[in-house]
Amino acid sequence: MNPIIYTTLIMTVMSGTMLVMISSHWLLIWIGFEMNLLAMIPVLMKNFNPRATEAATKYFLTQATASMMLMMAIIINLLYSGQWTITKMFNPVAMTMMTMALAMKLGLSPFHFWVPEVTQGISLQAGLLLLTWQKLAPLSVLCQISQSINPNLMLTMAMLSILIGGWGGLNQTQLRKIMAYSSIAHMGWMTAVLPYNTTMTILNLLIYITMTLAMFMLLIHSSATTTLSLSHTWNKMPVITSLMMVTLLSMGGLPPLSGFMPKWMIIQEMTKNESIIMPTLMAMTALLNLYFYMRLAYSSSLTMFPSTNNMKMKWQFEHTKQMKLLPTMIVLSTLVLPMTPALSSLN
């Protein structure tokens, strides 16, 4: 693809998201979503092959359905309230449709089926964009209407997402699908605390984006897309593989690392609001995610797979492109836990 066209498409995707985030008018929000969707399709199909075309088609159909439901909810709310501004939703049917449409855009369960399939069919760079930037617009709208959302509906979808995100990743060997199921589980954690505290949701989103960005940059750096290819990276780039192991454990929420902080703060916030059973179930279900992260860390760093090369280390490393942002992302995705007291005072 022509670099100028590709840059224009990326800028349009970002402009659409920005329009959604800064707007208080429902029509502008819908236009922002459509801008974002139409520019995202060619980005997903940058590597033009049947798998990418199929993934882009699935993404388009899902997002178009969600946009249709969103517009229907907006019109129903307009009939009852007579205004286009984002205020309290006056009609429960409109509110339910709105929540379902945004859940479909986010990839929350039970509308999650498109996320692993689309992520698997596209490149790692497009997958990074899909699992990070594309979450901003729907979550920003959910944060703005959080006071009107039915908490039982939101918590049910959140719990299902955490469960599906853990179960779905257990038997996977494709790293992109594992990252997709990880994304579904993280979205579940974010939306679980949404009815109680939107600041906590935003904080969790920022840490999730940092960890996912670091992980995808490591995968792009090592060109690994399966667990088998990941197991051979130790011979080629031991430092990158070690960093990958720590980042994976952070994504699983292991205590000394950054990924533990949002889980800790979300459970604390929910128990403050006299919700005990839900956070207990969430914490237990998070062990599923931790299991497959630890399995990946074990296979990548702690085992030496059979190789035709008898040397433990290659004397000449492959030439790889420098990623100047990578050290910063690694530090942020592993060492932010000591900042918990300062961040918890933001509520």
From Swiss-Prot:
<dbReference type="InterPro" id="IPR050175">
    <property type="entry name" value="Complex_I_Subunit_2"/>
</dbReference>
<feature type="transmembrane region" description="Helical">
    <location>
        <begin position="3"/>
        <end position="23"/>
    </location>
</feature>
<feature type="transmembrane region" description="Helical">
    <location>
        <begin position="274"/>
        <end position="294"/>
    </location>
</feature>
<feature type="transmembrane region" description="Helical">
    <location>
        <begin position="237"/>
        <end position="257"/>
    </location>
</feature>
<feature type="transmembrane region" description="Helical">
    <location>
        <begin position="200"/>
        <end position="220"/>
    </location>
</feature>
<dbReference type="InterPro" id="IPR001750">
    <property type="entry name" value="ND/Mrp_TM"/>
</dbReference>
<keyword id="KW-0812">Transmembrane</keyword>
<keyword id="KW-1133">Transmembrane helix</keyword>
<keyword id="KW-0496">Mitochondrion</keyword>
<feature type="transmembrane region" description="Helical">
    <location>
        <begin position="149"/>
        <end position="169"/>
    </location>
</feature>
<comment type="function">
    <text>Core subunit of the mitochondrial membrane respiratory chain NADH dehydrogenase (Complex I) which catalyzes electron transfer from NADH through the respiratory chain, using ubiquinone as an electron acceptor. Essential for the catalytic activity and assembly of complex I.</text>
</comment>
<keyword id="KW-0249">Electron transport</keyword>
<dbReference type="InterPro" id="IPR003917">
    <property type="entry name" value="NADH_UbQ_OxRdtase_chain2"/>
</dbReference>
<feature type="transmembrane region" description="Helical">
    <location>
        <begin position="178"/>
        <end position="198"/>
    </location>
</feature>
<dbReference type="GO" id="GO:0032981">
    <property type="term" value="P:mitochondrial respiratory chain complex I assembly"/>
</dbReference>
<dbReference type="GO" id="GO:0008137">
    <property type="term" value="F:NADH dehydrogenase (ubiquinone) activity"/>
</dbReference>
<keyword id="KW-1278">Translocase</keyword>
<dbReference type="GO" id="GO:0045271">
    <property type="term" value="C:respiratory chain complex I"/>
</dbReference>
<comment type="subunit">
    <text>Core subunit of respiratory chain NADH dehydrogenase (Complex I) which is composed of 45 different subunits. Interacts with TMEM242.</text>
</comment>
<keyword id="KW-0813">Transport</keyword>
<feature type="transmembrane region" description="Helical">
    <location>
        <begin position="59"/>
        <end position="79"/>
    </location>
</feature>
<dbReference type="GO" id="GO:0072593">
    <property type="term" value="P:reactive oxygen species metabolic process"/>
</dbReference>
<keyword id="KW-0472">Membrane</keyword>
<feature type="transmembrane region" description="Helical">
    <location>
        <begin position="325"/>
        <end position="345"/>
    </location>
</feature>
<protein>
    <recommendedName>
        <fullName>NADH-ubiquinone oxidoreductase chain 2</fullName>
        <ecNumber>7.1.1.2</ecNumber>
    </recommendedName>
</protein>
<feature type="transmembrane region" description="Helical">
    <location>
        <begin position="25"/>
        <end position="45"/>
    </location>
</feature>
<keyword id="KW-0999">Mitochondrion inner membrane</keyword>
<comment type="similarity">
    <text>Belongs to the complex I subunit 2 family.</text>
</comment>
<keyword id="KW-0679">Respiratory chain</keyword>
<dbReference type="GO" id="GO:0006120">
    <property type="term" value="P:mitochondrial electron transport, NADH to ubiquinone"/>
</dbReference>
<keyword id="KW-0520">NAD</keyword>
<keyword id="KW-0830">Ubiquinone</keyword>
<feature type="transmembrane region" description="Helical">
    <location>
        <begin position="89"/>
        <end position="109"/>
    </location>
</feature>
<dbReference type="InterPro" id="IPR010933">
    <property type="entry name" value="NADH_DH_su2_C"/>
</dbReference>
<dbReference type="Pfam" id="PF06444">
    <property type="entry name" value="NADH_dehy_S2_C"/>
</dbReference>
<dbReference type="GO" id="GO:0005743">
    <property type="term" value="C:mitochondrial inner membrane"/>
</dbReference>
<dbReference type="Pfam" id="PF00361">
    <property type="entry name" value="Proton_antipo_M"/>
</dbReference>
